[in-house]
Amino acid sequence: MQCMLGTPSHAKSYPFPVPGRSYIFRNGKVEDLSPDGFDRAGRTPVLAAGSNQSHEQLTRKYSVLEGHVEIPVQRGKLGGFDSVYAAHLAGYGSVPSTFYPSPKTQVTTYVLWLDDAQLNRMHETERNYTYDRLENIQVVIDGEEVLTTAYAYTAVV
């Protein structure tokens, strides 16, 4: 596992900037998501709480992969959960967040559509979390589509 130590200012800037819209993360760059969508075959929907929503964090995590890296990232609203502080420190010194059940709450999140290599890399960077399948959820993507099953990394709170 690669350690992602940073400066105190890096830790304090958590959860890092997000584009505020759905996008394609392509080799460290943010690009517009095609109106025609993308091919979901072979991809797993993973909800991002905290820094995994940020293209800056995705760049840090995925720069170790060889070849072309392309991750569709969709902005959505997750119902019945909130994003709260986790009970541990990240490797770079910030207090990260995790999803926690919260009826009547809606939180903005991003859905990362990861292929197998990207998912394996994400597992390597999320060792303080459990990888959970969330069923019967409601993620309204870009105000239209509803996703009812996805995965998330959950931490002790």
Q: Where are these predicted regions, by residue range?
A:
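Glycine-aromatic micro-motifs
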Residues: 1-157
